[in-house]
C-alpha cells in the first residue's frame, strides 16, 4: 500500500479488507472488520495484521499440542499423527493401561488376571521381601512430587491393597517364586531398575532405602535360575555312557570307562617303554582302575605326558644297583654317580682339574699334554669308580686306544705315560663337566668284590660303545688273556 501526497490531497485510496475466515473456528469468526470506505491508518495497520495472524497460528498450535501431547512417564504409547485417531483425548489412552508397571506395584500384583506384562507378578515378591519398608515408602502425602500422574487410585486404596498383598505373600514365603519357570525370574531386575528411576529420584529423603529395598531381592533370582538349569542337563548326559566324555561329566566315572579303554593305545603305551603310564598314576587319586587299564583318558595327561622319558623306568631294571639310573634322570645329583655314565677321558680330566692329584697325574705345560706320574694309582682309582678291583694300567691303556680313533686323545710319541687331548680346552671342559658339575669321585669300593664274582663280559661297562670295534683291529690284545678265572 502506497500513499502519495500531492497538493495536500490523497492521490490514491486503497480500501483494506480482511480475508474471510472459516466458519469452523469460533474465535476467528469474531475478527474485527474495517469498513471499506474508511481509510486505514498507516501506523495501526501492521500491528493489527500481525496480531490477528499470530493469534490464528497460536490457536492452531495450542490445539495441536494439546491433542498430540503424550505424558512423560508413559513410555509405551507412540502417537500416530497420520491416522484419523491422532486427535483423541489423552485420558482415554491412560485408562487403557491402568495396570501398567508404572502404576503402584502392589495394585498390579494383587489383581490376578493375566496381564501382557511380566513385571506385575514380580513386584509382589520384591515388595513382600521387606514389607515394613515398602509401607513406609508409600506413606507420603498425596501432593508429593514423586507420585505418578497415571495412578487412578487414591492413597488409601493403595495402602490397603499393599497390606493385603504383603500379608498374603508372607503367609506363603517359599511358594511364590520357587515354582515359577526360569523366564519369570529374569524380569524383576529390569522391573526394579525402571520402577525406581522415576520415583526414587523425586523423593529426596527416601531414594536410598527405596532403591535398596527393590534392588536387594532381585539379584538372587538369576542365580537360582542358573543352578536349576545347569544341573538337569548334566545329570542326564552323565547317565548316558556312550555320549559322555572322560572327566567332564561330574563324578559319573562308569560313563567314561568306554572312552578310557579306547585311548589306551594312543597315550599309555610306547614301543620302548611299555609299562610307564600305569606306574605313576595312583598318586593322582585314582583307586578304581587297575594298573593294566589305560587311565590316561581321565583328562590328566597334561600333567603326565610332558615328561614320559624322564620318569618312565622299565620295571625289570629295578634290580641290583641299576636303580641309580632313575635318580640321575631327574638331575638331582651329579650325573657321574650313575654306574656307566662316567667315561674314562672324563675321569682323567676330573683328576687333572684337582690340584691335590698332582703327585700321580699332572699337566706337562705343553698345550693339553698330561703325564701319568703313577699310572697304577690312576688305574686303581679308575677301578674304584667302576667297582673293578682288578683294574691295572695294562687294561687302562687298552681302553685309551679307543679315544685315538675317535680323535679325543693321542699318545705322545717317544715319551712314556704321556698323552694329550686334541680338542680345544673350552670344548674339553664343557663336554667333560656338563652344567659345570664336577664328578664326585669315590675313594673306596662300594662293597668288597672278589675275582670269583666277575663274569667274562662284566668289563663291558668300561667302554660299552667301542668294544665291538676294538675286537677287530687288535685281536692279539684279547681281554681273556688278562684275567685269571
UniProtKB/Swiss-Prot annotation:
PTM entry text: Sumoylated; enhanced upon ERK/MAP kinase pathway activation it positively regulates the transcriptional activator capacity. Sumoylation at Lys-95 probably requires phosphorylation at Ser-100. Transiently polysumoylated and desumoylated by SENP1. Sumoylation is a prerequisite to polyubiquitination which in turn increases proteasomal-mediated degradation. Probably polyubiquitinated by RNF4 and deubiquitinated by USP2.
Record flagged with keyword Transcription regulation: yes
Tissue expression remark: Epididymis and brain.
Subcellular location: Nucleus
Phosphoserine found at: 100, 139, 148, 215
InterPro entries (alphabetical): Ets_dom, ETS_fam, ETS_PEA3_N, WH-like_DNA-bd_sf, WH_DNA-bd_sf
Top-level taxon in the UniProt lineage: Eukaryota
Residues in cross-link Glycyl lysine isopeptide (Lys-Gly) (interchain with G-Cter in SUMO2): 6, 138, 323
Gene3D superfamilies xrefs: Winged helix-like DNA-binding domain superfamily/Winged helix DNA-binding domain (1.10.10.10)
Biological processes, Gene Ontology terms: branching involved in mammary gland duct morphogenesis; motor neuron axon guidance; negative regulation of mammary gland epithelial cell proliferation; positive regulation of DNA-templated transcription; positive regulation of gene expression; positive regulation of keratinocyte differentiation; positive regulation of transcription by RNA polymerase II; stem cell differentiation
DNA-binding region: 342-422
Cross-link (Glycyl lysine isopeptide (Lys-Gly) (interchain with G-Cter in SUMO)): 95, 227, 261
Keywords from the UniProt entry: Activator, DNA-binding, Isopeptide bond, Nucleus, Phosphoprotein, Transcription, Transcription regulation, Ubl conjugation
Gene Ontology CC: one annotated term: nucleus
Disordered: annotated segments: 79-114, 135-214
PROSITE patterns according to UniProt: ETS_DOMAIN_1, ETS_DOMAIN_2, ETS_DOMAIN_3
Summary of the function given for this chain in its UniProt record: Transcriptional activator. May play a role in keratinocyte differentiation.
Cited PANTHER family: ETS, ETS TRANSLOCATION VARIANT 4
Family to which this protein belongs: Belongs to the ETS family.
Protein name: ETS translocation variant 4
Originating organism: Mus musculus
The encoding gene: Etv4
Amino acid at each position: 500500500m502506497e500513499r502519495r501526497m500531492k497538493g495536500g490531497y490523497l492521490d490514491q485510496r486503497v480500501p483494506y479488507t480482511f480475508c474471510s475466515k472459516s466458519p469452523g473456528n469460533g474465535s476467528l469468526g469474531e475478527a474485527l472488520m474495517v469498513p471499506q470506505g474508511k481509510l486505514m491508518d498507516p501506523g495501526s495497520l501492521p500491528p493489527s495484521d500481525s496480531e490477528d495472524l499470530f493469534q490464528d497460528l497460536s490457536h492452531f498450535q495450542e490445539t495441536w499440542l494439546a491433542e498430540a501431547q503424550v505424558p512423560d512417564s508413559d513410555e509405551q504409547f507412540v502417537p500416530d499423527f497420520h491416522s484419523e485417531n491422532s486427535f483423541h483425548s489423552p485420558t482415554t489412552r491412560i485408562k487403557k493401561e491402568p495396570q501398567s508397571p508404572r502404576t503402584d506395584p502392589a495394585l498390579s500384583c494383587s489383581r490376578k488376571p493375566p496381564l501382557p506384562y511380566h513385571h506385575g507378578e514380580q513386584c509382589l515378591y520384591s515388595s513382600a521381601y521387606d514389607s515394613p519398608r515398602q509401607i513406609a515408602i508409600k506413606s507420603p502425602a498425596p501432593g508429593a512430587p514423586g507420585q505418578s500422574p497415571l495412578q487412578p487410585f487414591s492413597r488409601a486404596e493403595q495402602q490397603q491393597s499393599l497390606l493385603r498383598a504383603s500379608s498374603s505373600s508372607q503367609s506363603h514365603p517359599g511358594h511364590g517364586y520357587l515354582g515359577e519357570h526360569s523366564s519369570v525370574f529374569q524380569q524383576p531386575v529390569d522391573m526394579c531398575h525402571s520402577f525406581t528411576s522415576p520415583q526414587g529420584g523425586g523423593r529426596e529423603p527416601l531414594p536410598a532405602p527405596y532403591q535398596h529395598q527393590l534392588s536387594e531381592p532381585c539379584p538372587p533370582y538369576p542365580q537360582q535360575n542358573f543352578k536349576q538349569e545347569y544341573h538337569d542337563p548334566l545329570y542326564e548326559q552323565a547317565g548316558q555312557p556312550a555320549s559322555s566324555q572322560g572327566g567332564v561329566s561330574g563324578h559319573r566315572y562308569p560313563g567314561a570307562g568306554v572312552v578310557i579303554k579306547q585311548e589306551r593305545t594312543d597315550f599309555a603305551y610306547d614301543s620302548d617303554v611299555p609299562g610307564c603310564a600305569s606306574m605313576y598314576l595312583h598318586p593322582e587319586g585314582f583307586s578304581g582302575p587297575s594298573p593294566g587299564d589305560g587311565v590316561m583318558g581321565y583328562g590328566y595327561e597334561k600333567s603326565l605326558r610332558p615328561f614320559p622319558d624322564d620318569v618312565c623306568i622299565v620295571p625289570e631294571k629295578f634290580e641290583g644297583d641299576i636303580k641309580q639310573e632313575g635318580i640321575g634322570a631327574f638331575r638331582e645329583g651329579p650325573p657321574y654317580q650313575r654306574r656307566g655314565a662316567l667315561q674314562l677321558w672324563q675321569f682323567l680330566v676330573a683328576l687333572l682339574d684337582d690340584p691335590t692329584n698332582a703327585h700321580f697325574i699332572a699337566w706337562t705345560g705343553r698345550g693339553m699334554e698330561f703325564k701319568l706320574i703313577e699310572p697304577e694309582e690312576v688305574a686303581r682309582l679308575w677301578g674304584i669308580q667302576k667297582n673293578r678291583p682288578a683294574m691295572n694300567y695294562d687294561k687302562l691303556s687298552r681302553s685309551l686306544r679307543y679315544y685315538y680313533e675317535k680323535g679325543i686323545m693321542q699318545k705322545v710319541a717317544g715319551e712314556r705315560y704321556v698323552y694329550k687331548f686334541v680338542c680345544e680346552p673350552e670344548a674339553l671342559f664343557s663336554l667333560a663337566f656338563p652344567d659345570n658339575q664336577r664328578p664326585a669321585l669315590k675313594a673306596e669300593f662300594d662293597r668288597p668284590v672278589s675275582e670269583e664274582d666277575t663274569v667274562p663280559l662284566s668289563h663291558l661297562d668300561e667302554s660299552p660303545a667301542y668294544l665291538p670295534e676294538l675286537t677287530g683291529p687288535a685281536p692279539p690284545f684279547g681281554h681273556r688273556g688278562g684275567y685269571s678265572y
